[in-house]
Amino acid sequence: LSPDELLALGQKGRKQTVKRGQTLVWEGDDSLVVANVISGVLKLSVSTADGREQIVGIVFPSDFIGRPFGKESPYSVTALSDAEVCVFHRSTFDQFAREHPELQHKLLQRTLIELDDARQWMMLLGKKTAEERIATLLLRISERLSADGCTGPLLNLDEFELPMDRQQMADILGLTIETVSRQLTRIKSSGVIALPDRRRVVIHDRQALLDLAEAA
């Protein structure tokens, strides 16, 4: 979109702060809004038949949330950290998209990227070991959080705060919380990373972490 079009679109939305643990959209609700993530990290989750939560995605700054042309939300959207989003009424966004074909093209690109991403995660869950899954997740988080530099100071890729706890990591990766804790300790003991506290991660040897992630 051109700068003028971006400005026009921005004027149709409103900024909203979402506190850690607060749900922005509930699974099954009418899809009344869409949003762009300005800062923070949010999770996409669905409820299983037995009532458990399954995390199906993580969204970072610059990511888009919602189904512009959908009827209802296929998942809940909940903040993993304090976040700020720009929210648009779906009908307003739909009308703007119809008037600006370039935006529809961008939405199609986004859909294809999400499809590729889903295929990569299928491989991760189906082929990689627990250690490889955790290494992949740590790398993904460090790389995506660096995008926050577009709205603030550039973050250090090699030092960041995990937006989720151990149980949520386990849910995302299809592991038990015990396995997640054990593998994190193992990677830490090898000197590849440091864990100053429960949330903080420092990558000491990025190449070694890449090697762990790509061992499969």
Over which residues does each language-model region extend?
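Short aromatic/basic micro-patch
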Residues: V34, I58, V87, P163, ...
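Short loop/turn motifs at secondary-structure junctions and domain boundaries
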Residues: L7-A8, L24-G28, L154
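Polybasic "coupling" helices that flank or enter modular domains
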Residues: R98, E102-T176
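Phosphate-/nucleic-acid-contacting segments
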Residues: E143-A216
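Cyclic-nucleotide recognition modules
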Residues: G57-Q120
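Cyclic nucleotide-binding regulatory domains
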Residues: Q22-D82
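Cyclic nucleotide-binding regulatory module and flanking cytosolic helices
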Residues: L1-R20, D63-I65, G70
